[in-house]
């Protein structure tokens, strides 16, 4: 169905859609976008057209990923910064195609395995030797186990330091257990997560609970445990699966459907490393005195600080905490509005 739709999309229609997406991102205060392209999800022409458009027009920077097994040379030729993104180890919970160790509660099936641990290892080895970040789409616990086993095999072969240096990236990583989290930390993997998934489908009566049962669903998207283990989190939307919504994404991470699983630590600071969105450091322009800056100006309804004493509320207006004020993201309240977006010193959006 996707291939048929793309085949009927003209170059002009594609450019109009891409331009609209870039414009909307700028309006939302987004200065950097990651495009997860690949032969199974889009096309080389789609990726190169988007990268060219982003270079030509004032708007967010776009960093491309090409999700094709072993295609390091193709990724470089297309201008991608990584060989990964939508490189599918499994599918999705909703379609019963995320690969699980135990069957789905509502179907008895175990999901789909699109790549083996050996294929993961071959891809990660090729990327590591080429100095390029690798990445995979992996949601289910069996798929994540295949990723960990594959990456660990490369670490055994090429050395742990070489693997860790590239911060290979895993999209979604929703069903990680304690052993998987420890492995992510050990191997230097970045978890590219979508908190809006939990907001949309988590909870005792959500789609995840229907598919997996309440116990497994409660353990999904363990943001707090990942942060405690030192695993870098890149917060994203997987748009158009969920909408581009920066502060809504942060709110969903902070106010997880399973209270002990979310993390207020996921809130950004003025120099949030996660703002790089999981890019390998070799592709990130580090800020410095006199360098063109990228930032957004926000109008929050109220600024709060996080209380240092866990016996009181997590959110407080008490300035004695010593924590810089951040927007009140309490569910149900208004989110900050973007007044201006600046990308590398150029204003790309100014609210009217």
Ranges and model annotations:
Residues 56-86, 167-178, 205-232:
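Phosphate/diphosphate-binding loops
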Residues 81-97, 189-199:
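Non-cysteine beta-strand/loop elements that form the S-adenosyl-L-methionine
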Residues 1-69, 74, 94-143, 167, ...:
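Divalent metal-binding segments
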Residues 114-153, 272, 279-302:
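Long hydrophobic segments that form regular secondary structure
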Residues 39-40, 68, 140-142, 174-176, ...:
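Active-site-proximal loop/turn and secondary-structure-junction residues that shape catalytic pockets
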Residues 78-82, 152, 184-192, 229-232, ...:
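Glycine-enriched alpha-helix->loop->beta-strand junction motifs that scaffold or abut catalytic
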